């Protein structure tokens, strides 16, 4: 006789804890924070991927802070403005004036890879490179926050009231490039970012194999669906870790010229095809292969490709249909009727497939239309892509349900492009936040803007919805400018160059690195020594004899008259 199975109480308790956690996750997702977020998985899926040991992450507190900051800017039609930070010095100086921090993959690639091998921004560095830089800066933020607290709690109330408080814990948004590979690579990268201190991460829609800086040529896009998978993978990892890390979706569709595949119908309307029937059966890849077999190389191959492209008369399918209608026999009114019908059926928001487009074209009488998107494929197999703001808008529509901000990479600071993109994306997703790269790759002086227009550029596009704006490489360029000009002057004038260019300017501007021992935390660790040794230490770093005492004394040196009343200066306590 079969015996009935009795479920042990331990199993029931396990299931009870699991279901309670599932309900907790579902309630979290139902909060205001995620009202715009779409997930193709369930709360049960997330909890199943978690371990039994619940963990918390400091970066989550900063992620919530970043979200509040950005939503406040969005509500006020203003922007969080920041730039790429290179090191702890920069990140602590930025904290006094800015409300977010950016960590650039370009800067890391050129100055701080985990292998110490520098190079251009091709995302070919180890995938822990940017997370390591995030940790470097996040540790510095926490350290200077601790140091400030010790300093302030050593002051009287009156002294604290006169000493500005600096919020060093500004949220960091980091460059996740393309996610560094497949789904599991993206998941592991995002886990690293959370553990290392990132409050936000951006991921772009370029191919991870051919990734380039957004302002280089030769960019290859992945299909819309593949990038959505990257965003979903990132969100899933954040959900598994129980964090609210801000996710930024970047598109390079404005300037991209190639795309990996034609698998997604949302990309079809931007893929280029050959329209010259004389090239039927003569693919570019085949022509180049024959030329290489014949011994041609370099410039000869390039000339052959240029000639083939010129002959191919590349067009999108819609352009091909439009031209065919306009060149067909018939009255002008008949042509206009067909053109209107085509435009109505093939508008960008409908994202019709090429197969659907061909069916519509045939119904309009275009039965023998020659258009072939395989013929112009590159030797690597990539399809030709017609990049545009509209292509970026279509991708923005697709990415918005899976991201918190949308970023369109551009080739110039163009207000018309910004306006078109913002209105286009918001026509479908009115509440989505937008991001903008105030790139140093732009020659701003050649943009046609006046100084006043440059000054107003950030607030102008902020009113369009670009509530997070950043100069990716300002830390890099500022570092280079200061060191180059100082080194040149120092070689010529010696110590006077240092005193005039740096020491006096630090003093004039209240820069706390003037007292660099204090800035680095000597007082803070003296407190440790004294605490361990009962309140006194003969080896305290900031004790009698420290040269930094010189910066607390009045002095009337010749040449210092421009630094204070009658040349007498008393350096106040550090702003820290």
From Swiss-Prot:
Involved in storage lipid mobilization during the growth of higher plant seedling. This is Isocitrate lyase. Its cofactor is Mg(2+). The keyword Magnesium applies. GO terms for molecular function: isocitrate lyase activity; metal ion binding. The lineage of its organism: Eukaryota, Viridiplantae, Streptophyta, Embryophyta, Tracheophyta. The keyword Lyase applies. Its EC number is 4.1.3.1. Substrate binds at residues 104-106, 214-215, 250, 437-441, 472. PROSITE patterns: ISOCITRATE_LYASE. It comes from Cucurbita maxima (Pumpkin).
